[in-house]
């Protein structure tokens, strides 16, 4: 059985901002740090029109979540601020999400939010408040290596969130703290119960926070009207099979909902936004040997030009790591080559690179896929 005293940041008494979402994880972090004698300041971000989601269960950053965060702060007796980040969130996350779908990609808004809002902007705010550190409820670990802070997976594989934090910079990592990285979710809930927090049994968020009903297509059509223009569905062998209802309705690897009859199962293999074409083919057509990633954030020692490094990579948060070989292509691109072919590599998703439990870096999957 773990003890609260065993979970500490290794820091002297400090002023620490805690990013409080209203869920059990960040609430437990705030309570833990407060008990350890730190000067804790809670901050909750209002990221979108939460009126859309009031009363919606299992959605992050809804009106109920803001209320829950404030109630936890009141119970602990710590200052708590709600910051209006709606405009920043729309520009950095929602607009990016919509544009990514219109470009035939499969976006990952949680990573964009962590990068552009929760870390970049919130760290700036925490510094302005005079805080020494920013703590979050993410299930990852920060380990001090020979060359500075390193990002590592959470000890509980079922809750590890390192895939979503690959854009964290070295400078940000030095300022951040992740007290839950060595715990399981059950241990976190027990910790919250120990502190008497009402959110101890609150369900985890499941939906994309700004899509409380799960209907992302309605959000896209609201922001970009007439975005569901129909077009051709073409077999990878070159013949036309039918008509699609708009490329926003399709993603790489999709099988259901194609609306076409054929003598074998067909999958979405490629999406061409320029010519508004959805390409389909047999499952074997999904096999990928190599691809290019862009906007690489690298957290390890620099890779030399023409150097090849054998690593493990994840191309979806729910998939296990696969062995691959990476090489540098200029300042912000890399080539990733699987040792064994992988299926359904989707542009717009993240490719996160690991050496054991350490996150070396990552980037965004481009259409340069072979």
From Swiss-Prot:
Keywords: ATP-binding, Cytoplasm, Disulfide bond, Nucleotide-binding, RNA-binding, Transferase, tRNA processing, tRNA-binding
GO molecular function, a single term: tRNA-uridine 2-sulfurtransferase activity
One Pfam match: tRNA_Me_trans_M
Disulfide pairings: 113-209
Cytoplasm keyword on record: yes
Cellular-component GO terms for this entry: cytoplasm
GO biological process, one term: tRNA wobble position uridine thiolation
Site (Interaction with tRNA): 138, 349
Residues forming the catalytic site: 113 (nucleophile), 209 (cysteine persulfide intermediate)
Main function: Catalyzes the 2-thiolation of uridine at the wobble position (U34) of tRNA, leading to the formation of s(2)U34.
HAMAP family recorded: tRNA_thiouridyl_MnmA
Entry protein name: tRNA-specific 2-thiouridylase MnmA
Naturally occurring in which organism (per UniProt): Rickettsia conorii (strain ATCC VR-613 / Malish 7)
